[in-house]
Amino acid sequence: MKWNDISKDQMKYDVTIPFIRQLAGPMDYTQGAMLNATKKDFYPCYFKPMSQGTRCHQLALYMILDSPLNMLCDSPTHYNKEIECTEFIASIPTVWNETRIIDGEVGEWIITARRNNSIWYVGGITNWTSRDVKLDLSFLPQGKYKIEIFKDGINADRNATDYKKDFFVTEDITKIHKLHLAPGGGFAMKIEGYLP
């Protein structure tokens, strides 16, 4: 799929496969591209391979797809230049105690939450349609949480590598209730219980 001609819609594939192929169990996907392109800017290039969609879309795939042997699809040089994203990817477990599909529609978008011990990882992606998604985290018990979130940057619709990282502590997890996803976009979040 990734090396096929430009007419292939990788974003639609990404928001379809979790609903169909994942029913059979874990799969290999090889996500994690650091060279990201908008629909307009993408082209197959052997010497400078890139992914369709935003950087946060790529990060979110680590939560959305169940793969106990995750890979990195890009050059080590690119990961060395993108330490913030690389460290986040390295922190994501490959085995889970619990999985919840929070919301989604086949071929449109999906939001998945996965728990490893007491830490939750939440990822959401969309097809080429930008959208505001509601994030229902009401399944989490009341308490104080430390949140790390990567979300599409304000210019991600023009520059797919643009993202914003936020880090904060909250006592009201429901405050994170709406996120904007750029075309081909996504978000990736780590939620840890927090004791002062």
What are these regions (language model features)?
Residues 1-76, 102:
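Glycan-recognition surfaces
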Residues 64, 122, 184:
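Conserved, mostly hydrophobic/aromatic
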Residues 73, 123-124, 131-135, 145-148, ...:
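Extended hydrophobic-aromatic, low-complexity segments
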Residues 74-121, 157-161:
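Glycan-recognition and catalytic regions of carbohydrate-active enzymes
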Residues 79-85, 128-131, 138-155:
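Active/binding-pocket-proximal capping segment
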Residues 106-142, 187-188:
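Carbohydrate-binding surface patches
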Residues 149-174:
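Solvent-exposed beta-strand/loop surfaces of large extracellular or lumenal domains
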Residues 166-196:
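C-terminal beta-strand-rich structural cap/linker in extracellular carbohydrate-active enzymes
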